[in-house]
Amino acid sequence: MVHGSVTFRDVAIDFSQEEWECLQPDQRTLYRDVMLENYSHLISLGSSISKPDVITLLEQEKEPWIVVSKETSRWYPDLESKYGPEKISPENDIFEINLPKHVIKQISKTLGLEAFYFRNDSEYRSRFEGRQGHQEGYINQKIISYEEMPAYTHASPIHNTHKPYECKECGKYFSCGSNLIQHQSIHTGEKPYKCKECGKAFQLHIQLTRHQKFHTGEKTFECKECGKAFNLPTQLNRHKNIHTVKKLFECKECGKSFNRSSNLTQHQSIHAGVKPYQCKECGKAFNRGSNLIQHQKIHSNEKPFVCRECEMAFRYHYQLIEHCRIHTGEKPFECKECRKAFTLLTKLVRHQKIHMGEKPFECRECGKAFSLLNQLNRHKNIHTGEKPFECKECGKSFNRSSNLIQHQSIHADVKPYECKECGKGFNRGANLIQHQKIHSNEKPFVCRECEMAFRYHYQLIQHCQIHTGGKPFECKECGKAFSLLTQLARHKNIHTGEKPFECKDCGKAFNRGSNLVQHQSIHTGEKPYECKECGKAFRLHLQLSQHEKTHTGEKPFECKECGKFFRRGSNLNQHRSIHTGKKPFECKECGKAFRLHMHLIRHQKFHTGEKPFECKECGKAFSLHTQLNHHKNIHTGEKPFKCKECGKSFNRVSNLVQHQSIHAGVKPYECKECGKGFSRVSNLIQHQKTHSSAKPFVCKECRKTFRYHYQLTEHYRIHTGEKPFECKECGKAFGLLTQLAQHQIIHTGEKPFKCKECGKAFNRGSNLVQPQSIHTGEKPYECKECGKAFRLHLQLSLHQKLVQVRNPLNVRNVGQPSDISSNLLNIRKFILG
């Protein structure tokens, strides 16, 4: 051997059993990496050495056992009982046994090398026999478990004269003093090698060198199949399994296969429920030591991995790698089924289960199955109610650490992830990725029933339950069932009244962070979502999506009861309650019940008098933001929605839809009392109140009652004299916007409503309906007292007042409708007293 040349033994690292057991799983992985990397560097320097047996075993991720024959066991009969056979081969009279290095040395002195059969036997034996002076080193490098010396040897371990430096802690010898100093740091815990980039410290210099590659981005180990590069050889070896797809180790419990025995062992602990590694901080247990180490970083708050783009810090290096792909847009893992690409292999594996439909993890409580174990673990918290992670700001608890971290960003108001398309910021990279799909219009998830496409898988799941009608999540308070767990969680806040998210501008509180974010855009006036058809801008993407359907006319959701179509599934669900008549939301003030919770909230503001939304033009305040938006159109005069039939324009799409039903003549909503049809359900609801005679709205001034709140508002203006709506043509003022709209037709002379029977035109749709009944002869309004029928509800009202005053006025008979005018004076006198 040439003096000064480097051999594999010069760079090999040895461990005793005591040392090996002190190492954490990630440190054992480091050993594999270091040994493989050292060998790789020697080859790259031009060393013409054959591959050591230990390298072959490490590449295959096998344990390097020593193999002993039965002949040896006759000379040393207590070997088998002392150390135990690992594998017996009756044909060759051979068994595997785990021996300490000094026992191997002692046996080889007595019986020679023929007592042993080494793996890769001929190759290893020739090298071993050629290096008699290095027997101990070659066997020691194979990570053989180190035991106490058995009684039969009667000798101390033989120490090589080339290793004069002894460790006083464990008795291990080293050839260099520097190696001894490095080794002693294992016992002392000293970490003298510090990274200048992030400050992290290490026990060994090789660990620091490996770590620095994360900062430099150096990736010297490249896959020949796909060209992907890695920092470490073990990473490359694991990656190669993706291409070979060898899975030799199968779980007997669930049939799942693995390409490494260690992965199978780790997986089997899931079925066994064994979790020997417990956190001293919070008591949480894990089935792997590496998982415990990762978990403990949550308590220490250590985040050594920093992104150079946005300076965001992470606990784990894999999190930094995943995060960096948000900036680069790299998605190296592609699904062969639908061509969708992912930033991480784990996400691809998770996605592929959607196509396979595989769900091996089942909940023992309710039988629900999941494709991933972490999904099952999250689901279990529903049954246990456990929420160990608490926010120090507001006291809210979560069942997952990631949810707590996401929640805390709401308080910190940190939004490091910015969309390059529209500039919107997000506190999570996942939210940015979801948001970017809005701009790309990508919708890879398609419903098999109706072929409707969705951007996200959860939207598809939610949509499918419209077809199946499945609602597995039930509220224990009121029994209401929901198709999604998030809907149930949102609903529960109605009962608890909890609203932890408060607006700093106006103090209004919300039960969801997303609602607060939506609300804050009211103060900023930001409207980033613009319609490409008409240029109208919206605060929320949902509003834009709804608006776009007005241009396309798309209505995929059909009511099976009456055949009506809707643009949104939520609108269909709301509509269904009309047929069922169910009204689960009741006002505690007046007992009035509502079909929807939002209707109850709107109603309650009438009792409280709360009007937080004020018009900057005229100072008028409103209880709802939508009311303010409608009001603003009075000042701007904007009417973007135009009827194609008659050219009339409207400031709201709902008004246009309502108007179009006049031309179509469609009236799907029929009153069960009198059979009258209506084009809108709200009109039917208003009409039904005429039959019930309920008048819940009372004037505080004169105690007069009204069926509708708008009637009370209109009536108040009689007392106050307020007339806020002024005609710009003649200056005349009105108490109601509808009165102003009717008046303005006088100036324009517009009469868009034409009778098909006689051709007569009218400036109001209600005026058209009245003469049409002349042609049809229809009289739907009947007096319950005398059975007389009328064409118009106004005629019925006047008739009922005549009947009411008949006795006090000594009126014996009420004749034809022409008699009404002759009695008006008497009615007026009676009413005024």
Swiss-Prot record:
May be involved in transcriptional regulation. Pfam families: KRAB, zf-C2H2, zf-C2H2_6. One of its GO terms (cellular component) is nucleus. The gene is ZNF780B. The keyword Transmembrane does not apply. SMART domains: KRAB, ZnF_C2H2. The lineage of its organism: Eukaryota, Metazoa, Chordata, Craniata, Vertebrata. One of its GO terms (molecular function) is zinc ion binding. PROSITE patterns: KRAB, ZINC_FINGER_C2H2_1, ZINC_FINGER_C2H2_2. Keywords: DNA-binding, Metal-binding, Nucleus, Repeat, Transcription, Transcription regulation, Zinc, Zinc-finger. Belongs to the krueppel C2H2-type zinc-finger protein family. GO terms for biological process: regulation of transcription by RNA polymerase II. The keyword Methyltransferase does not apply. SUPFAM superfamilies: beta-beta-alpha zinc fingers, KRAB domain (Kruppel-associated box). This is Zinc finger protein 780B.
